[in-house]
Design a protein with these regions (language model features):
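Condensing-enzyme catalytic core of the thiolase-fold
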Residues: 1-232
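Short glycine-/aliphatic-rich beta-strand segments at the starts of folded cytosolic domains
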Residues: 236-243
């Protein structure tokens, strides 16, 4: 994401989405909008069995994910709490993970009064219901540190959460201190990313298996043992949307 022209900034300012303080105060009483950031990220996705066979350095395991859309709701910029709850429940159902096991959630957290409040309520309904009152769920948002990368914000959050579960430490959001990973093994984290058009995405990450195998010249493929309580659930048919300015162009 590169801010090379003024148009997007002008439109966001007119929408009232940008923070006049130039800071992103995610989940903070001072939340008054976000600050735009620049950056990008790339990850290599590989089947776990193939990565283990090849002796790759596995940073995390993607246990499950879900995507939905609430674009038919109250308006373009109005998030839907129930839709966010549904995408969270579906992601953890596909991952075979009880929401109460999650040790950290990387928020979408743009730092807007409405968006943060809705996201907090959805997380509380789904991930807070099964938690011990003495073990609150740590949350954070990379946007407080690097701003909102807009189209690249999701991959930034994914990379941050992957490093969290791999290193067993939660880095600080702006004005906070780092913290050790809460109890529980393996380390599990959730990552949320929401689009302005109503698309909601949540991914469940798990710490890599230990110890990490080293590749050898005579290494042989081997079966990966998946515990019965962690079945793989295929998400079903995936849409391939097409659009055009006219029906004839769409057919072509």
């Amino acid at each position: 994401n590169l801010n090379v022209g003024p148009d997007t900034a002008i439109n966001l300012a007119a929408l009232g989405a940008l923070s006049p303080d130039g800071r992103c105060f995610t989940f903070d009483a001072r939340a008054n909008g976000f600050v735009r950031g620049e950056g990008g990220g790339v990850v290599v996705l590989k089947r776990l069995q193939a990565a283990l066979d090849d002796g790759d350095d596995v940073l995390c395991v993607i246990r499950g994910s879900a995507v939905n859309n609430d674009g038919g709701g109250e308006g373009l910029t109005a998030p839907d709490q129930r839709a966010q709850e549904r995408v969270l429940r579906l992601a953890y159902e596909r991952a075979g993970v009880a929401p109460g096991q999650v040790g950290y959630v990387e928020l979408h957290g743009t730092g807007t009064p409405l968006g943060d409040r809705v996201e907090a309520a959805a997380l509380g309904e789904v991930l807070g219901a099964e938690r011990d009152p003495g073990s609150p769920l740590p949350v954070g948002a990379a946007k407080t540190n690097i701003g909102h990368l807009e189209g690249a914000a999701g991959i930034a959050g994914l990379i941050k959460a992957a490093l969290c579960v791999e290193r067993g430490e939660i880095p600080p959001s702006l004005t906070f201190a780092s913290a050790p990973w809460p109890g529980g093994s393996p380390a599990l984290a959730g990552v949320s990313s929401f689009g302005i058009g109503g698309t909601n995405c949540h991914v469940v990450l798990e710490a890599p298996p230990e110890p990490r195998p080293q590749a050898t010249a005579d290494s042989q493929p081997r079966d990966l043992e998946v515990p019965a309580e962690r079945p793989f659930a295929w998400p079903g048919p995936l849409p391939f949307p097409l659009s055009a300015q006219a029906p004839a162009a769409l057919r072509e």
